[in-house]
Amino acid sequence: MGLFHKKDSRSHDSRNDKAAIRPSVTIDKLSEYSIRSPKLVSDSGSNGHLPRMVTTIPNNVEIPPAPDPATKPAAYLRSIQSVRERSRLVLMRAKSNSLNHFNVDMSKFQETADYVMSIIKRDYAGDYANIPPHGRWQHFEVGGRPRVTQLLQSWPTTIDNQERTRRLIDLFLVSVLLDAGAGTSWSYKSKESGRMYSRSEGLAVASLEMFKAGYFSSDKNQPHQVDASGLKNVTVETLAKGMQVSDANPMSGLEGRAGLLIRLSSALQNPELFGTEGRPGNMIDYLMSHPTTQAASVPVVPLPTLWSVLMDGLTDIWPATRTKIGGVSLGDAWNCTTMPTSPPAEAWENIVPFHKLTQWLCYSLMVPMTKLLNVHFAGAELMTGLPEYRNGGLLVDTGLLTLKDADAKKGLETYQRVTPSNKAVEVVPMFEPGDDVVVELRAVTVGFLDELLAAVNKGLGARLTLAQMLEAGTWKSGREIAQVSRPITKGPPIGIISDGTVF
């Protein structure tokens, strides 16, 4: 990871060398790193692609408004609507270059949009409608190997689509919860192919192979499931074994991941949402029978109904140290000094919510439900861009955002403190997840992703959904520009000390 390159045995400050990473300069070199997101092989008749998710609300599907923050601040900050509304306040300050920790060069915005468009054109020119939505499925298929399709084909034909979807949701939920940043040193060698993978794809392949081996199931006769009793047996040691973690192959946040799965075991003991078995996949039965679900030619589920299952049903999995209001844990929501407040400020006014892992769950779980059961989600446009290090790193690496000097100095001191001297390469400012620098960056990332979607669609003459732009554009662009800017670690320009529960 690094804002700085190692060159001639000296640290080189890439913040002052933006020309080296501008899209127009690097696009030819970047092409060697990327592959087109794989088609998701489906049943015959669907042309190998997922059905498109509903992005407009049918007239007869009512989307409930967010709770009133004045009377129910905790409920409001846990709602999906609050993420965009609160982050937009930070975006407004960014546009006037009045952030606390970053300088904003709006002249770089169009360059950033042009770079994202160049990546999308390179991989999908003339085929924009078939860009898959951002989700965990694509990570499983790294290297062009259709692992999810092969998993589906391995099950007897007597297993109906509802149970197949339950099993995929079991897998996807655990895999997403394990998807926090693993660090730049960890990798995984697939037991099936012998190939090495790292980062999100490595975590995806590792979690899939653990799932197939029955790590998360209490039923020896049915290893391909996740249940509360099976998760009770998870320990740091078993997770380390499954993830191939060792002194020579360290993973950031291993203990945090294990703790998340152990707490998930308790959260799944909710028969109304997850059945008597305590399986994540049983949420399908809850959603299909929910009074807000409309069963017309296809099932139509309001997005807030799925959101409620994940936010309310999984509340107990988040660390006890997370921000609270009135004793209610808010999950991935943090105090931010950039938030405007009205005197006398209420406690909730300083908080900006992100709910990144919950949103990543939503994006990922909608895919198998849409693909196998043809479920449509009304109100999917309430989802936001994901405030994580690839999307945020893109804004920094293109020069749209530049960390202020005092914060850069503080972050570099943290890097030197937590990084062994013999492993200090491509040095970057580093911060804790709750640091005001990180919270401000995440908030402005959510806002700028909305702005980029409008600019990208205008430039391409397309109608991409936000989920499609995340998949084919910003997430991939953030990764590729990082690979060129920091070719050793391929990490983001601002480092996060991962606890395994945020990113």
Model-derived regions, located:
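Extended, well-ordered protein cores
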Residues: 4, 8, 14-368, 372, ...
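Long, intrinsically disordered, low-complexity Ser/Thr/Pro-rich regulatory/activation regions
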Residues: 406-430, 434
